[in-house]
Regions:
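A short, small-residue-rich loop immediately preceding and capping a beta-strand
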Residues: 74-95, 108-110
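Contiguous domain-boundary segments centered on the initiation and propagation of an alpha-helix
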Residues: 63-71, 75-82, 392-400, 405-407
């Protein structure tokens, strides 16, 4: 008996294609005389849709809700295996955390794939920036957004959703090549059928996802994240996943791996390519082979296909004309475009895309690969805000006219659910284009596609918990040094500690936010996974 847990809904383009997956799975598992049931659905929130809206304050919490919903779906104790259908930021980590609570079950993940490329990410970002300057009308902005996000499938930039798929394939928890096949590609249905057949076969083996997910598999996931400069969100997501699997992972671990992991991709926001181009020029098969050959990943792991991550170094081929079955080509040994994907011997950088910053303000995460070298070091006065909209208003009113370190505090997990502050990117990018040196420091999140502006995010301890951010004043001199990994407030320690903590804005209610008060009271800090489990 196979249990299906799905994040299907009609709101998210990434999840809409999954409407017919349960029927396909049920049909396929009947062939070996098995049965599949739809065990349960889980919610799926899109941070792109909820940017700047009340729902963004529920986004972080939704991951743990999804984990609990997954556990409820599987708790009937009927199942011998599980199929997880999900794609986006919180959804895959939540499904994985919930699945690990049933570690005895063989479990396979199946995504829907990216939408075909539309308006390029570079053009989209430029129009957003022009709109922030008042040069593009709202209707033109809407046209651009509709041209970029124009059909079913995952967003094509390399943000949290596509990072999820990269990491799951690097962990061997999906069928090889499944990460980036588009929804309407005929291979997508065959991949879903192959996963269905495979999970039935795995029910005859003694091990499940709990045994597979060991420290080597977790390291492989983080190396894949760093080699592709994936989503900053996953510095919290995979810490929480590691804990669900029984391991402790720290930001120091991630930073240490980043120092020795080369950056091999030029995907937006680190470059101009999207995931469709990445898949076309070599994709995960090339990337994983390069990292394995360089000794940067563990091959001695168990995957849903069997022993060894090297099983994932063959590329998905075209469908056989006569067989209508999936085919694989031998190991991909050359990238078809070095502006998109490079070998270990010719990396974009000798270090990975994410960096840990530390100092007397706490510690923070930064996506260094998206920041040009000339913008990586700044010492400037602080401009302190509590809300994203306050920053945008100040920029529009030309109140930020000199080099500045913008502080947005009281946006952490216990303060207000750690919302993404991606609307800051266009506004602060305008300041960069005016020749100013600008950096951002916040205890909130940015998008998985954060770029251009040096953004020290996920600051911990957060302001609401008495962290240093709560005692920073306008005009204090602050240094953000991305290269050395330094975050420094140039205020005497005694003076800083003698200051009163700034008031924490009261958590807002309405739009369902009042239902999540228990999360505010019990959530762990960002570097421990920002989770209510095991705090």
């Amino acid at each position: 008996m196979i249990g299906i847990v799905s994040a299907y809904n009609d709101v998210l383009s990434a999840h809409q294609p999954m409407a017919n997956y349960p029927a396909i799975i049920k049909d396929e598992v009947r062939k070996p005389a098995a049965v599949a049931q739809f065990a349960g659905g889980v919610p799926a929130i899109c941070d792109g849709v909820t940017q700047g809206q009340p729902g963004m304050e529920l986004s972080l919490f939704s991951r743990d809700v999804i984990a609990m919903s997954t556990a409820i779906a599987l708790t009937h104790d009927l199942y011998d295996g599980a199929m997880m259908l999900g794609v986006c930021d919180k959804i895959v980590p939540g499904l994985l955390m919930g699945g690990l609570a049933f570690g005895q079950l063989p479990t396979i993940f199946m995504p829907a794939g990216p939408m075909p490329s539309g308006l390029s990410n570079k053009e989209k970002a430029n129009i957003r920036k022009q709109h922030a300057e008042g040069k593009v009308a709202p209707d033109k902005l809407l046209e651009a957004e509709m041209a970029a996000y124009h059909t079913e499938g995952t967003c094509t930039f390399y943000g949290s959703a596509n990072s999820n798929q990269m990491l799951l394939e690097a962990m061997g928890l999906m069928i090889p090549g499944a990460a980036f096949v588009q929804p309407n590609d005929p291979r997508r249905m065959l991949l879903t059928r192959a996963a269905s057949a495979r999970v039935v076969a795995l029910t005859t083996t003694p091990e499940g996802i709990g045994e597979w997910t060991n420290e080597r598999l977790l390291v492989n996931a983080i190396v894949a994240l760093l080699a592709t400069s994936g989503s900053t969100n996953h510095t919290m997501r995979w810490v929480a996943i590691a804990r669900a699997a029984g391991f402790e992972m720290t930001w120091q671990d991630i930073d240490a791996l980043s120092r020795v992991t080369p950056l091999l991709t030029g995907l937006y926001p680190n470059g101009e390519a999207d995931v469709n181009e990445f898949n076309r020029v070599g994709g995960t098969a090339f990337l994983l082979r390069e990292l394995l050959d360089a000794g940067l990943m563990h091959d001695d792991v168990d995957t849903v296909m069997g022993r060894g991550l090297s099983l994932y170094t063959r590329a998905l081929g075209e469908i056989g004309a006569d067989t209508h079955k999936l085919t694989y080509v031998p190991e991909v040994k050359r990238s078809q475009d070095l502006t998109v994907l490079r070998p270990v011997a010719e990396p974009f950088s000798t270090e990975g895309g994410l960096r840990l910053l530390k100092g007397n303000q706490g510690q923070a995460i930064l996506k260094i690969s998206a920041v040009s070298p000339e913008h990586r070091v700044i010492t400037a006065p602080a401009h302190v805000f509590d809300m994203q909209i306050e920053v945008i208003t100040a920029c529009k009113a030309n109140r930020v006219v000199a080099d500045s370190v913008v502080i947005v505090r009281n946006r952490g997990p216990c303060a207000c659910g750690m919302p993404e502050l991606h609307q800051l990117t266009p506004a602060l990018s305008v300041l960069l284009d005016r020749g100013l040196k600008v950096a951002l420091i916040t205890d909130g999140r940015m998008s998985g596609a954060s770029g251009r502006v040096p953004a020290a995010i996920h600051v911990t301890p957060e302001a609401a918990a008495g962290g240093a951010l709560t005692r920073i004043h306008d005009g204090d001199i602050v240094t953000v040094d991305c290269d050395s990994g330094t975050l420094h407030l140039h205020v005497d320690a005694a003076t800083h500690l003698a200051r009163s903590n700034a008031p924490t804005p009261a958590a807002k209610s309405g739009w369902g936010r009042e239902l999540f008060a228990v999360f505010h009271d019990n959530i762990s800090v960002a570097d421990c996974g920002a989770s209510i489990f095991g705090n």
